[in-house]
């Protein structure tokens, strides 16, 4: 067990140097540890037996895909590139990202009391700036440029910084929240119920969204708000390359999935209008 701990520690250092996010490092380490503790070897056949075991345990293709990525990464770390290439992730059907309607966004915001300045700010940053939950939690006060009305999102997915302009309403929300703070934490948003004001945790964000979503009768997650940001921007005519930069996507193809969402939105609108049908129906 001690030997495995040492391997995992070195592997995590390798992932960190590769620029992987803390969440990716945590997930990869978890699956590699399970693999090694189960007697896994640096051979593709051994990995396939492990994947078959997880399949029997009920793992979906999407989950198995993550495990394959972790094992391929670990094999490369150990210098077994050829074995890594033999591992092929299962096909995962592409699904359109789920987003909220504008009315649903307004409804959820309406159930967050104006006195809950922190909670409203969390919601508005996820939707109004399209942030990932990890990026939101890592924001520092120094990342807000009040003069130019923008925030600097540092070390997001892929370890790339990006600049996100924010509207005046959101900037005022940040100022209003900071005026309620009497701590010296460097983080923009902190936990409320602790003596020491630690930075906001993803768990808290998920909890708050579930609470207010239940109150509004709408299912909402941090990623759904990010999807909604992108979809609504596209519907408003914003250029897809600008949306790509705002989201921090390295590949345009990742952003282009939102065009499918918008096409579906337009298709439904056309079906509802029934313009052609109205011409030919008696």
UniProtKB/Swiss-Prot annotation:
Chain ranges of the Core-binding (CB) domain: 2-79
Any one Gene Ontology molecular-function term assigned to this protein's record: tyrosine-based site-specific recombinase activity
Pfam families listed in its UniProt record: Phage_int_SAM_1, Phage_integrase
Active-site residues (renumbered): 132, 157, 223, 226, 249, 258
Cellular component per GO, a single term: cytoplasm
Subcellular location: Cytoplasm
Broad class of the protein's primary localization: cytoplasm
InterPro entries: CB, DNA_brk_join_enz, Integrase-like_cat_sf, Integrase_catalytic, Integrase_recombinase_N, Integrase_SAM-like_N, Tyrosine_recombinase_XerCD, XerA
Keywords in alphabetical order: Cytoplasm, DNA integration, DNA recombination, DNA-binding
GO annotation terms (biological process): DNA transposition
Span of domain Tyr recombinase: 95-271
NCBIfam families: recomb_XerA_Arch (NF040815)
Annotated family: Belongs to the 'phage' integrase family. XerA subfamily.
Protein task: Site-specific tyrosine recombinase, which acts by catalyzing the cutting and rejoining of the recombining DNA molecules.
Protein name in UniProt: Tyrosine recombinase XerA
Gene name, Swiss-Prot/TrEMBL: xerA
